[in-house]
Amino acid sequence: MRNVFWRQIRLLLVVFIGYLFHVTVMTQLDTTVSINLPLVILSVVIVGYPRYKAFWGGAVYGILLETMVPGVKLLNLVFYPICAMLMSLFFTDKSAARLQYDMSNHRRGRNRSVYLRTPLCALCATLLYEAVSIIYIAMSSAELTSAFFTRALTDALMTTLTAVVLMWPLRRLLGFGAPVSKAMAKG
């Protein structure tokens, strides 16, 4: 019980420290695009925790970014929880019942590597965020140029690379050990 409590406290700290780094450190970097640090942390949470905690993390980021960071009205408040739930459909661990069902239907009944799913989750979430942003720009009657799409792809790649770098320390901080291989589990 005590371990579960401290794991929740660590999750809360990671979410809030990630928000603080996003609004302080990431805005000071001298780059043309901003790395979306909340999506990096959400991708680690989505892969490591159940769906309701992914929604909780997305809701916290949505509320904080909506109230503290000026931008498109209600975009962050709506986007982050929906994105967390949508990405959790594809990137969370399969339940034991789902694994058993897959194996009974002669399919591959196993989860993919967390070290593959985390960057893919960050990439998909960032591409979704950039697509929503580009659609909003197009709806506001602005002319879309190739610079918008170049920045969107650059942001997606930089966010994915940041997820690759930060997933190991974040997983250790959140209390996830290295995945156990089948050979180690048997022996």
Descriptions of predicted regions:
Residues 1-187:
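Terminal, non-globular segments
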